[in-house]
């Protein structure tokens, strides 16, 4: 079976809001702030089961997220010991017979900032989110990434860089999506950090996406 390594990203320390968001939304072993985390997204998705099996048998990491959807599969594992997480990553790469350098280079598909969000729009956003609430008058940053898994990298780095609220993050599917809220200045700083994090990831260039 030929495997495409779509996302492979190591987070040295989960930030408080992202760790808490994962804890609220995931169905596995929930992480806490400060733990190291590894996110792996592959195609075809069903192969993610073999990935989880290999990582858990070889190391002490715990999985929070395993998603098998139509085309892609996503796995998150975490541990306080960064060495355990890195070892899990090496095991996964060996199992799939791929290299980290062969991962897809992420693209920013959409990035937008809405200033002074109206009250009615905040209600719509909050009803469809699982994180912090956005309040009327705050600024909203929306980011879409391809592959989807890199949305968590953007979220983690944005939280490191600015005092913002993590409204929602979706790291699986065709595109990853990130919603952040806060003051105008803090959102500007968060957006810059999130996009810089995506640009910093090396990998195999993708063909430009075309909506058919």
Curated annotation (Swiss-Prot):
<dbReference type="InterPro" id="IPR044870">
    <property type="entry name" value="BMC_CP"/>
</dbReference>
<feature type="short sequence motif" description="Pore gating residues">
    <location>
        <begin position="69"/>
        <end position="70"/>
    </location>
</feature>
<comment type="function">
    <text>A minor component of the bacterial microcompartment (BMC) shell. Expression of 5 proteins in E.coli (BMC-H (Hoch_5815), BMC-P (Hoch_5814), and 3 BMC-T (Hoch_5812, Hoch_5816, Hoch_3341)) forms 40 nm artificial BMCs with a molecular mass of 6.5 MDa. One of 2 stacked pseudohexamers in the BMC. There are 20 BMC-T pseudohexamers per BMC, composed of mixed BMC-T1, BMC-T2 and BMC-T3. The shell facets are 20-30 Angstroms thick, with 1 of the stacked BMC-T trimers protruding to the exterior.</text>
</comment>
<comment type="subunit">
    <text>Homotrimerizes to form a pseudohexamer. These stack, with the concave faces together, in purified bacterial microcompartments (BMC).</text>
</comment>
<protein>
    <recommendedName>
        <fullName>Bacterial microcompartment protein trimer-2</fullName>
    </recommendedName>
</protein>
<dbReference type="GO" id="GO:0031469">
    <property type="term" value="C:bacterial microcompartment"/>
</dbReference>
<feature type="domain" description="BMC circularly permuted 1">
    <location>
        <begin position="4"/>
        <end position="106"/>
    </location>
</feature>
<dbReference type="InterPro" id="IPR037233">
    <property type="entry name" value="CcmK-like_sf"/>
</dbReference>
<dbReference type="Pfam" id="PF00936">
    <property type="entry name" value="BMC"/>
</dbReference>
<feature type="domain" description="BMC circularly permuted 2">
    <location>
        <begin position="107"/>
        <end position="211"/>
    </location>
</feature>
<dbReference type="InterPro" id="IPR000249">
    <property type="entry name" value="BMC_dom"/>
</dbReference>
<comment type="similarity">
    <text>Belongs to the EutL/PduB family.</text>
</comment>
<keyword id="KW-1283">Bacterial microcompartment</keyword>
């Amino acid at each position: 079976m030929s495997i495409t390594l779509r996302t492979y990203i190591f987070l040295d320390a989960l930030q408080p809001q992202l760790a808490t968001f994962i804890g609220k939304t995931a169905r596995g072993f929930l992480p806490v702030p400060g733990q190291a985390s590894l996110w792996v997204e592959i195609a075809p998705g069903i192969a993610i089961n073999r990935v989880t099996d290999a990582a858990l048998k070889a190391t002490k990491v715990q999985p929070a997220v395993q998603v098998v959807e139509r085309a892609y599969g996503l796995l998150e594992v975490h541990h306080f010991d960064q060495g355990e997480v890195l070892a899990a990553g090496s095991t996964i790469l060996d199992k799939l017979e791929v290299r980290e350098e062969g991962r897809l280079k992420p693209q920013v598909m959409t990035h937008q900032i809405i200033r002074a969000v109206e009250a009615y729009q905040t209600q719509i956003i909050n009803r469809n989110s699982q994180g912090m609430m956005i309040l009327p008058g705050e600024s909203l940053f929306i980011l879409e990434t391809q592959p989807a898994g890199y949305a968590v990298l953007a979220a983690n780095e944005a939280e490191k860089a600015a005092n913002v609220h993590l409204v929602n993050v979706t790291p699986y599917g065709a595109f990853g999506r990130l919603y952040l809220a806060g003051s105008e200045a803090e959102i500007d700083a968060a957006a810059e950090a999130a996009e810089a994090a995506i640009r910093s990831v090396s990998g195999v260039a993708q063909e430009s996406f075309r909506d058919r």
